[in-house]
Curated annotation (Swiss-Prot):
Enzyme's top EC category: ligase
Lineage: Bacteria, Pseudomonadati, Pseudomonadota, Alphaproteobacteria, Caulobacterales
Residue sites binding Mg(2+) per the record: D71, E145
Species for this entry: Caulobacter vibrioides (strain NA1000 / CB15N)
HAMAP family for the chain: PyrG
Function per UniProt: Catalyzes the ATP-dependent amination of UTP to CTP with either L-glutamine or ammonia as the source of nitrogen. Regulates intracellular CTP levels through interactions with the four ribonucleotide triphosphates.
The name this protein goes by in its record: CTP synthase
Domain of life: Bacteria
Residue numbers annotated as active site: C388, H522, E524
Activity regulation information from UniProt: Allosterically activated by GTP, when glutamine is the substrate; GTP has no effect on the reaction when ammonia is the substrate. The allosteric effector GTP functions by stabilizing the protein conformation that binds the tetrahedral intermediate(s) formed during glutamine hydrolysis. Inhibited by the product CTP, via allosteric rather than competitive inhibition.
Amino acid sequence: MTRYIFITGGVVSSLGKGLASAALGALLQARGYKVRLRKLDPYLNVDPGTMSPYQHGEVFVTDDGAETDLDLGHYERFTGVSATKADNITTGQIYKTIIEKERRGDYLGATVQVIPHVTNEIKDFVLSPAMDETGEKAVDFVLVEIGGTVGDIEGLPFFEAIRQLRQDLPRGQSCYVHLTLLPFIKTAGEMKTKPTQHSVKELRSIGIQPDILLCRCEQEIPPEEKRKIAQFCNVRPSAVIQAMDSSSIYAVPIDYHEQGLDAEVLDVFGMRDAPAPDLTRWKTIDDTVQHPDGEVTIAVVGKYTVLKDAYKSLIEALHHGGLANKVKVNLDWVESETFEGDEGAAAARLENAHAIMVPGGFGERGAEGKIRAAQFARERKVPYFGICFGMQMAVIETLRNVAGIKDASSSEFGPTERPVVGIMTEWIKGNETVQRRANDDLGGTMRLGAYDAVLTAGSKIAEIYGATEISERHRHRYEVNIGYVHLMEDAGLKLTGRSPNGVLPEIVERDDHPWFIGVQYHPELKSRPFAPHPLFASFIAAAKEHGRLV
């Protein structure tokens, strides 16, 4: 029997519902249960693929090619369960489906309304088969996070749907967890419970009585305040769970367990004889974070650096590399435009970095700065890791400054006589050929999801992976032009990874450099704290070695 846990938020956004959902999933896993996490996003976009990173943050890509919310990255990293298209839905997708059904005549002339048609689509999504990773057995728990906060007009159909689900499901098969804020007013020296009371009042006004309150706070909640919250919010005092800031995000499962979150959830389901959790691996990770053997500084040269959520998976993957090497990873965020128009700016800013990371991105803005970062890394023998756009800029840098093709560029930046990087028009997906054109819609038209690659035997990349065949996740529309590979290799940048049909360049590396690798895919999307991606583990090891040498 599958049980459902609905996680909602109140008072303000960005309290950490995604992290709380992921941590609760990890705690249930630690007790031996199978879990799957899903996200309901109330915005009207079909997916976040065309949304600005400044507004939405990172777009997390699944193996099956879904462009999803960054919270699915938290889910994967904390549970190790790979998300799919079936784990994220938006209002845009729901309305698109309903309108298509109406045009086909599926509703048999009925007036199409929010209730029941929209709410039924939401319920069907929530209740769709949730299988474990073998695909053979249903999971024990489905955790469903509702985006936004209670009271948002966009979220009303979702709250109505989960209200109905409590009645639709057998008794004792659902649980509501509400994440809220307990602000501490320093001038008054008091913790204020009124925002939480009003948030729960709003939730109850639409027919949802939370079973558990997860209260974000800066200080410990005094017992009398817990009793007050419980009384006014109609929950047991034991169901008022304190959620203070943790020393690191990987300490969150431990902290929530100590506060009794998982035990309280299981009590709601009447599962009082559940196995005790095994939190050994989380304690090991937290101990490594708290007691590193050293530090390294990684310069991250990007264009969305003012909003760190735009690089959420990348940040975590770099820290996973630190865990693998038992070092603390300090990130020096460098706006790539800083280097444009100033020859010495790159050298001055990157001088103290132990390694340089140039992550993915889109568009011409900041591109020249990334090219200069790649040049600095190549000339100074500083470890360099280019991901997606970062690989493309490394190729352009080599062809400009080593091969002497001064006008080498990307067709993404406009018409060019030397399209070293060009738009992809055709590639293989499974057994089918996918075709795209420059004037296609932007949404959902990139090369998305997991693709295989073949690595050159004896190359550094093959040594790092310990294999010559790999599968990684992609999200890109442009690719290194295969017609320039011979010039690139003559200039010292070797192509050591291709698509299985040999047409698409996937990986480049320099054999005259301690660690200089560019990959067209996004390895950060598959890294886990308890299974760091080998590329990030190797990159941080190279940074550690470079730091020792300098």
